[in-house]
Regions:
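Catalytic beta/alpha-barrel core
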Residues: 83-90, 103-115, 131-140, 163-164
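Active-site mouth loops of central-metabolism enzymes
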Residues: 19-33, 85-87, 201-208
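Conserved small/polar residues in nucleotide/adenosyl-binding loops
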Residues: 232-238
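Short, acidic/polar
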Residues: 30-39, 89-94, 210-214
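N-terminal amphipathic alpha-helix/helix-capping segment at the start of soluble metabolic enzymes
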Residues: 1-21
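Conserved, mostly hydrophobic/aromatic
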Residues: 23, 48, 97, 199, ...
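Catalytic alpha/beta core domains of metabolic enzymes, predominantly
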Residues: 125, 129-226
Length: 239
């Protein structure tokens, strides 16, 4: 399979494995965001991530700080020099992020599973040239995952990357999401030029599993890691 891709270009970031993206799963307060960003910047991390719109399985939970969080990400960018990344699920999210100067966007697993939603995002991104990362769908459907890349690529986006965050399962004895490594391996075989990131935090669901999952991803030739880190709960591997 051929997509019209080009390498992810973020000036100042070395082209070597692993490219690390880190930050809180959810931006909850400005203080939390800034404390975490400062800590990560001091450790040499160049790309800061934080979710500001959070799709939840059930209503009633915290669904993200919303547009207000974009100002916090802009402050991170201004005060630390880090690139900033967040998740988008609708065209409105895309417009707000582009207006705020967000550097990297990713599409979450629940959104990837909906071709209508992916197409809406693709249409909103036409004429834009920024890195777009796409998480695997919640179910282990490689064709659905590839279809999302095709939709975004057809809109003219060439700096694409995959995020492997595991797959939903009733079996949670070890992992929150089953890794099923053969699926991203097959993705690599089908689209060899597509960089693949591992999300060990969502796969493992436990702090103690993050480092070994990172190592396994590196052993399998993954290109980067996207790790959930907060100021009070550091999960970033030290190696």
């Amino acid at each position: 399979m051929e997509l019209d891709l080009k390498p992810i270009e973020l000036p100042g970031i070395e082209k070597k494995r692993p490219m690390i993206i880190a930050g809180p799963c959810s931006a909850e307060t400005e203080e939390q965001v800034m404390d975490t960003a400062t800590m990560l910047a001091n450790k040499g991390i160049k790309i800061f991530r934080a979710g500001i719109w959070k799709p939840r399985t059930k209503p009633g939970g915290f669904e993200g700080i919303g547009v207000d969080g974009l100002a916090w990400l802009k402050r991170v960018k201004q005060e630390t020099g880090m690139y900033v990344a967040t998740e988008v699920a609708t065209a409105k999210h895309v417009y707000e992020c582009l207006k705020a100067g967000i550097d990297v966007l990713w599409i979450g697993a629940r959104t990837t599973a909906n071709p209508f939603a992916v197409q809406e995002i693709a249409d909103a991104l036409k004429g834009v040239d920024i890195p777009i990362l796409i998480k695997n769908p919640v179910n282990p459907d490689l064709e659905l995952w590839i279809g999302a890349f095709e939709r975004i690529n057809n809109a003219g986006l060439k700096q694409l990357g995959a995020i492997h965050r595991g797959f939903s399962s009733y079996d949670k004895k070890i992992y929150r999401n089953l890794p099923q490594w053969h699926i991203p391996i097959e993705l690599r075989r089908r689209i060899p030029e597509l960089p693949i990131f591992c999300d060990p935090s969502h796969i493992g669901g436990k702090r103690e599993l993050v480092a070994p999952l990172c190592q396994q991803a590196m052993d399998l030739g993954f290109d980067g890691l996207i790790v959930a880190v907060s100021y009070t709960h550091l999960t970033l591997p030290t190696t």
